[in-house]
């Protein structure tokens, strides 16, 4: 592992443990066993390190999504993708919060854009089957993202207790019922 890779790995660990608000380059340097000039040589600034860490976090998120076994059924695939998205936030809430904060600031992160394209592809597959229950694929993708993000935020803000699984499932089911028309039953002749 190169010094740069080690600094990135330690930065991600620090973000997962403490969150972005408590992020400290001094702590990252100490944990990585390097001096501050080494960090600045590789990343230029604390924000440069944070930006690189967010890019790496989104890369890991995207790799997790790409590695998942996805059902050939579009609705099931959308459910799986939704569960994976929310699961990432549940597993890594502080890191997820930092990632979304970057997106909300308008930072362009190619892996985040590619993850959105995966969602768009899942919605397009539902539309291709004639099962889209909304006026457009864009509206359906926006709804899926917004409700998955809301469920993910329940994990991020869970200071005292984890969110009730029933609430997470209800959010997902609402999104799926709105996005997908019910399956047509085949008539026996």
Q: How would you label these PLM feature ranges?
A:
Residues 3-11, 28, 53-57, 61, ...:
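Generic hydrophobic, amphipathic alpha-helix propensity
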Residues 6, 10, 14-48, 52:
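Helix-turn-helix
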Residues 15, 49-57, 99, 108, ...:
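Alpha-helical DNA-contacting segments of helix-turn-helix folds
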Residues 53, 57, 61, 65, ...:
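Hydrophobic recognition helices of helix-based DNA-binding modules
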Residues 66-94, 144:
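Hydrophobic alpha-helical connector segments
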Residues 86-106, 153-161:
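Amphipathic alpha-helical segments used for helix-helix packing
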Residues 88, 105-131, 138-143, 166-180:
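Amphipathic alpha-helical packing segments from all-alpha helical-bundle domains
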Residues 125, 145-162, 177-187:
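Amphipathic C-terminal alpha-helical segment
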């Amino acid at each position: 592992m190169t010094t740069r890779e080690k600094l990135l790995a330690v930065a991600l660990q620090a973000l997962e443990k403490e969150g972005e608000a408590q992020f400290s380059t001094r702590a990252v340097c100490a944990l990585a066993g390097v001096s501050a000039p080494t960090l600045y040589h590789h990343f230029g600034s604390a924000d440069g390190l944070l930006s690189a860490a967010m890019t790496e976090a989104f890369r890991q998120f995207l790799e997790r999504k790409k590695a998942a076994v996805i059902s050939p059924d579009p609705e099931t695939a959308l459910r799986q993708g939704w569960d994976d998205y929310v699961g990432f936030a549940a597993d890594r809430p502080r890191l997820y919060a930092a990632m979304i904060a970057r997106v909300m600031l308008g930072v362009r992160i190619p892996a985040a854009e590619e993850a959105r394209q995966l969602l768009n592809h899942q919605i397009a597959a539902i539309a291709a089957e004639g099962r889209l229950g909304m006026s457009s694929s864009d509206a359906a993708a926006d709804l899926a993202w917004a409700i998955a993000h809301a469920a993910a935020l329940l994990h991020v803000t869970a200071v005292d207790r984890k969110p009730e699984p029933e609430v997470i499932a209800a959010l997902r089911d609402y999104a799926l019922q709105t996005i997908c028309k019910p399956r047509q039953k085949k008539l026996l002749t």
